[in-house]
């Protein structure tokens, strides 16, 4: 059942589809016909418009019109269709004219280009530039103010960025301070809370001072320490000072707190100075010595601080040496009245060594606060300046300056140690000496470590920067090469596109039109083919391919002779173009012949027109106009004939001159011909004038003798040796020796004559000339 149902469903579907197909209307061809008619009519309109532009001299517009017509017909009928031949022919003809216009140096090459508009745009641009130059003074001042404001904002931003930047050591110190919980105090809190916090911090200081006292000097009493601390606190409270435990850096704190509150920063370096001053008020006799000690101690503290900021390991050693040194000096000089100062120094040294760069701020209750009390302000300004100078070295001075300042300060610190040795306190002085000896060594080690670390960092940064620079250079080179390759490809493509110029495109279009027209047997098509050959010849002339041009003109002439009369002007044009091609190809005889044939055709045409004028009735304006045109052509053609004849003559003369120069260059062997002539002259003169020639030879022999003396001596000796034994061999006696000597002399004279004759025969032209002069 299922199969039957599916089969019935399929049959029903087929029937429905068949009904639909039958009901569907048949496609109408009216739309296609309308489109074809529209294309043909549009192409004809474009062809007419192009011919109009061509006659009017608007070559670019004609090219566009013919191109559009050819594209329309080519899409509809195909490129090789008969309907496209005329469009391709005119398109190629217009392209040829456009190429001539572009290649013409003296022609109107700018025709069709809107030069006036470009000049107007240039004048507008120039006017804009002049307006910028003619700006008012007020506007200039406003611009200057804006520029200065922008520059000031940039400088302010730079200053803020520099102030906010911190070194790594300061960041580490701040982290340690935050861990210790000493930055909990707020500046905006009231004075009572600040005093409470000051009391708590003072208690902590007392506890730390007691511990330091027990560790450093077990013999001191706790009452003295506490009394010294209470006195210090009372002095601070009486003067209205509140010491905060906030430890911040100078620059950061000055930025955070406004200057209107009038606060001052008092560093830990001045703390032992204040305590020593307050405690030495009752002892005026030892004030000077104590001030020197305090100055030395403050300088050492600041130096330790400036050195400990860079390094981390030797902090404890610097603190111990500092505390012991202060303890020993103050115990020996000030006695029991100043026993608290070493403890304070120890506290200050320990705190400085543990947390360098931290300071104690003094906040007023009502108004600004002075750094020290008026009653106890007895210290001179020099220690303060020195301390401030050394504290400044902590921020920006180099390690070398600190080293230079350590040496005189150590020398100043040595006399109190020597006095302590004289007093008998040997143990403490030895400890102080060891501390003072170890401290500078540690400081120098720290400085050396800092220098090495800085150098390593600089080297690493330099290597990284060099590596990055090299990578950047390589990347830049790779990008440049890729860009250059892309540009080269683009330029090659553009050059290839540009190489397909108007002449080549015109050749293609005309060749295609020639093929289309030659395929047709009608007279009109064959004449179009002849015109295509003519234009192809002109394209060849423009591209300086004269042989191809001659072939194309001959093909055109053969077709025209078949279908045209003998007096047709097209024949005259073809003969003229063929004569030009022969002339360009240096075939002047053929050129003159073709120009003559062109004149004959024109004369025939004029005769025919005159006959038609006689036979015709009515106006003769058309005939007269054409006759005038033909008469104007004749002088030009005759001038071409004269030019061809003259060029033929000049060409013959040039050929003769060239042949003459070639012959002269080939036959002008200067040295061989001159030598031969001189030798012949010498040979002819020798038999006639023997005496003079012999005299001349003797004159030259003196010269040759001087030049070739070592070469001529050996043959003379050999000849003499050979001549001497001859009489003895022949059985001669002693008288024969004299005769042999005479014979040898004669032999030598003959040998000399032979050598001189050989030299004269083998001499150059110059030697021959000298022979002639000496002989005369």
Curated annotation (Swiss-Prot):
Function: Component of the histone chaperone network. Binds and stabilizes histone H3-H4 not bound to chromatin to maintain a soluble reservoir and modulate degradation by chaperone-mediated autophagy. Required for DNA replication, normal cell cycle progression and cell proliferation. Forms a cytoplasmic complex with HSP90 and H1 linker histones and stimulates HSP90 ATPase activity. NASP and H1 histone are subsequently released from the complex and translocate to the nucleus where the histone is released for binding to DNA.
Motif (Nuclear localization signal): 704-710
Compositionally biased intervals (Basic and acidic residues): 141-160, 167-200, 267-276, 389-406, 435-445, 474-493, 709-727
Gene3D superfamilies: Tetratricopeptide repeat domain
Organism: Rattus norvegicus
Chain segments carrying region Histone-binding: 116-127, 210-242, 457-500
Protein name: Nuclear autoantigenic sperm protein
Protein family according to the UniProt entry: Belongs to the NASP family.
Single annotated GO MF: histone binding
């Amino acid at each position: 059942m299922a199969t039957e149902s599916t089969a019935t469903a399929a049959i029903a579907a087929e029937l429905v589809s068949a009904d639909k197909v039958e009901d569907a209307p048949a496609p109408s061809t009216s739309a296609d016909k309308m489109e074809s008619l529209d294309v043909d009519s549009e192409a004809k309109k474009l062809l007419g418009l192009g011919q109009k532009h061509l006659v009017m001299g608007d070559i670019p517009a004609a090219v566009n019109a013919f191109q559009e017509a050819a594209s329309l017909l080519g899409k509809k009928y195909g490129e090789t269709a008969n309907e496209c031949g005329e469009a391709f022919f005119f398109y190629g003809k217009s392209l040829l004219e456009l190429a001539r216009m572009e290649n013409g140096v003296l022609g109107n090459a700018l025709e069709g280009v809107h030069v006036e508009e470009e000049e107007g745009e240039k004048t507008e641009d120039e006017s804009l530039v002049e307006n910028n130059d003619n700006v008012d003074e007020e506007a200039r001042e406003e611009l200057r103010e804006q520029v200065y404001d922008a520059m000031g904002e940039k400088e302010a931003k730079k200053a803020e960025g520099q102030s906010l930047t911190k070194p790594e050591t300061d960041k580490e110190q701040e982290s340690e301070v935050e861990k210790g919980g000493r930055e909990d105090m707020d500046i905006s809190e009231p004075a009572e809370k600040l005093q409470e916090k000051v009391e708590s911090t003072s208690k902590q200081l007392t506890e730390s001072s007691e511990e330091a006292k027990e560790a450093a000097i077990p013999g001191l009493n706790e009452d003295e320490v506490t009394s010294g601390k209470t006195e210090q606190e009372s002095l601070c409270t009486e003067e209205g000072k509140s010491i905060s435990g906030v430890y911040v850096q100078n620059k950061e704190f000055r930025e955070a707190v406004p200057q209107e509150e009038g606060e001052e920063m008092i560093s830990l370096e001045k703390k032992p100075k204040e305590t020593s001053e307050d405690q030495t008020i009752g002892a005026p006799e030892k004030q000077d010595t104590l001030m020197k000690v305090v100055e030395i101690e403050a300088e050492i503290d600041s130096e330790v601080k400036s050195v400990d900021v860079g390094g981390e390991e030797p902090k404890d050693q610097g603190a111990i040496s500092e505390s012991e040194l202060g303890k020993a000096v103050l115990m020996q000089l000030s006695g029991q009245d100043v026993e608290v100062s070493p403890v304070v120094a120890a506290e200050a040294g320990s705190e400085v060594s543990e947390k360098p760069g931290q300071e104690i701020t003094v906040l007023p209750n009502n108004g600004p606060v002075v750094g020290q009390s008026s009653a106890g302000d007895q210290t001179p300004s020099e220690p303060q300046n020195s301390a401030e100078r050394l504290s400044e070295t902590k921020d920006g001075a180099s390690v070398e300056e600190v080293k230079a300042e350590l040496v005189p300060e150590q020398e100043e610190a040595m006399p109190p140690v020597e006095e302590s040795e004289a007093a008998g306190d040997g143990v403490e002085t030895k400890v102080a000496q060891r501390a003072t000896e170890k401290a500078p060594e540690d400081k120098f080690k720290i400085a050396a470590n800092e220098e090495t670390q800085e150098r390593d960092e600089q080297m690493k940064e330099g290597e990284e920067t060099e590596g990055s620079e090299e990578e950047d250079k390589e990347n830049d080179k790779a990008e440049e090469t890729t860009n250059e390759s892309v540009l080269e490809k683009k330029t090659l493509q553009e050059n290839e596109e540009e190489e397909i110029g108007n002449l080549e495109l015109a050749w293609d279009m005309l060749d295609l039109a020639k093929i289309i027209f030659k395929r047709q047997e009608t007279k009109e098509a064959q004449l179009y083919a002849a015109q295509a050959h003519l234009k192809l010849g002109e394209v060849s002339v423009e591209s300086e391919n004269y042989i191809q041009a001659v072939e194309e003109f001959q093909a055109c002439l053969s077709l025209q002779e078949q279908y045209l009369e003998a007096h047709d002007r097209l024949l005259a044009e073809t003969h003229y173009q063929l004569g030009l091609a022969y002339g360009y190809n240096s075939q002047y005889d053929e050129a003159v012949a073709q120009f003559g044939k062109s004149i004959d055709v024109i004369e025939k045409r004029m005769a025919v027109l005159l006959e038609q004028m006689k036979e015709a009735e009515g106006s003769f304006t058309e005939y007269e106009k054409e006759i005038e045109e033909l008469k104007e052509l004749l002088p030009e053609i005759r001038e071409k004939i004269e030019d061809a004849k003259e060029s033929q003559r000049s060409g013959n003369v040039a050929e003769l001159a060239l042949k003459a120069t070639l012959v002269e260059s080939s036959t002008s062997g200067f040295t061989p011909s001159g030598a031969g002539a001189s030798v012949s002259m010498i040979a002819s003169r020798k038999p006639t004038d023997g005496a003079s020639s012999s005299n001349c030879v003797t004159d030259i022999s003196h010269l040759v003798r001087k030049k070739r003396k070592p070469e001529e001596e050996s043959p003379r000796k050999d000849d003499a040796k050979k001549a001497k034994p001859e009489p003895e061999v022949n059985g001669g006696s002693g008288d024969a020796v004299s005769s042999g000597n005479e014979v040898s002399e004669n032999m030598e004279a003959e040998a000399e004559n032979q050598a001189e004759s050989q030299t004269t025969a083998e001499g150059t032209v110059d030697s021959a000339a000298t022979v002639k002069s000496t002989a005369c």
